[in-house]
Amino acid sequence: GIPVLQSFMNSYNSLYSLYFKKAHIACASLDLEDIRHLVPGTALSVICLYEYAIGFYVPSGNPKGITSLNALSGKNITIANREKGSTPRIYLDRFLLGSQISPASVSGYSTELVSDISTAAAVANHKADTALGEEYAAHQSGLLDFVPLETLPMYLVMETNALSQPGFAALLEIVRSEDFRTILQGQTGYDVTRTGELFSL
């Protein structure tokens, strides 16, 4: 077998590590244009792992009726935010900029946590009214509802020349296997319709 060292990073930092050759493969939940811009001057191969819904974690019953990002500008809504470079943070910041909403007007915006599990826990423990993230964290909590907003892709990103190497070619074969799809389908919120699709950037 081939030894694999894994490091948990957000999408931005994963691509940064790939660009500076500190990693051979990055896992990123950004669109293809973002990936291209963050790793310039490099031929890339991008494999779709799965698609998932990003949405709100809310207490059971959604007592404050949070159904859209516009709700975050309300003074009675406090958010548990993610760190810069994470997909939920990028998603939120783009919305705020596009809607001309000042981050300073969003209660809790400066509270940065480093995982979906931690933001979901903040909502479950009544330290925040809501947070953005993947459905699985709400499901694991058992105390939260999930309000989906949009479907996003999760990609594996590598330099194109790596695909000619046995370990990387084997990885693509695994991702395209029925066994891998079956495992993903057993996880909450993962859509395998596009699993195994390969893109060249």
Segments the model singles out, each with a brief description of its role:
Residues 7-16, 104-121:
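Short helix-initiation/N-cap motifs at beta->coil->alpha
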Residues 49, 58-79:
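Flexible hinge/capping segments at coil-to-helix
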Residues 27-39, 120-150:
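A ligand-binding cleft/hinge motif common to bilobed small-molecule-binding domains
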Residues 48-55, 144-173, 192-199:
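Periplasmic-binding protein-like
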Residues 76-96, 178-201:
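Ligand-binding clefts/hinges and TM-proximal coupling segments of bilobed small-molecule sensing domains
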Residues 1-59:
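N-terminal segment of the mature folded domain
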Residues 60-67, 101, 161-166:
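Short helix-loop capping/hinge motifs at secondary-structure junctions, enriched
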Residues 1, 82-84, 88-111:
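Ligand-binding cleft/hinge of the Venus flytrap
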